[in-house]
């Protein structure tokens, strides 16, 4: 859909916001209905990470009469939101596009593509590596004190939240990149404040891991640290190539000092 660069009055902005919110809501609702009927297949896919951890005689159980509907609806709404992520990101960026400078608008489409790829990379990484290790550890802890009777609803909910958490955490490089490249937060500030950043990432990792197990916490923290350092390396290369070393300390908003030295 076309996006005009012209400035609009307040009421036109509100009308544009309502139109884009309507597109998002209708799209998510339609995707939810479709995913609800595809839920049995999705359940089989989501059960794979735990199947290898189940011992003979153990099986995932549904304890209530409403459990089947609850599981299918839970899967449908969360998968629909994940599948609509590219469209949601596009609608957000398209709404703010008229406020951007011409040389900044060319970043919009690449941003949508990269953000989408990073999100789904995080989801796939969690599904293939994190979820199997986490549930293997959790079931082992359960068996050490009693008989394991894993509930399908709890497992599915935890797995979906884990995958969404890792998908969001994989957006970290994009956030750091744009903050530094557009000189909102200088690269030098990111590098100088690494101790505080590491502590914040540890707190965030503990907050967004729904199972509270040390396995997922350690994996999440390691992933966020790795992504942060890689994003800083890429950002430094781009900023120096475009603006020279002076760009490493430049701040457009003036919120951070320009006298910080690049310690690399």
Which stretches of residues belong to each language-model region?
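Membrane topogenic/interface segments and analogous intrinsically disordered interaction regions
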Residues: 1-264
């Amino acid at each position: 859909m076309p996006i005009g660069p012209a400035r609009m009055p307040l009421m036109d902005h509100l009308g544009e916001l309502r139109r884009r919110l309507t597109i998002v809501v209708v799209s998510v609702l339609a995707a939810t209905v479709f995913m609800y009927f595809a839920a049995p297949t999705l359940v089989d896919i989501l059960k794979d990470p735990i199947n290898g951890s189940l011992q003979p005689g153990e099986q995932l159980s549904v304890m209530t009469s409403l459990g089947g509907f609850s599981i299918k609806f839970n899967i449908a709404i969360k998968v629909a939101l994940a599948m609509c992520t590219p469209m949601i990101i596009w609608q957000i960026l398209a709404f703010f596009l008229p406020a951007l400078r011409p040389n900044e608008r060319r970043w919009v489409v690449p941003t949508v593509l990269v953000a989408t790829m990073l999100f789904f990379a995080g989801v796939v990484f969690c599904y293939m590596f994190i979820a199997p290790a986490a549930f293997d550890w959790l079931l082992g802890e359960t068996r050490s004190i009693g008989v394991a009777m894993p509930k399908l609803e709890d497992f599915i909910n935890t797995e979906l939240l884990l995958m969404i958490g890792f998908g969001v955490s994989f957006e970290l490089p994009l956030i750091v990149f744009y903050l530094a490249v557009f000189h909102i937060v200088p690269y030098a500030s990111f590098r100088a404040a690494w101790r505080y950043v590491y502590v914040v990432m540890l707190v965030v990792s503990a907050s967004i891991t729904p199972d509270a197990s040390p396995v997922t916490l350690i994996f999440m923290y390691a992933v966020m640290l790795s992504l942060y350092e890689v994003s800083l390396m890429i950002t430094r290369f781009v900023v120096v190539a475009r603006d020279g070393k002076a760009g490493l300390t430049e701040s457009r908003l003036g919120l951070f000092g320009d006298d910080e030295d690049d310690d690399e």
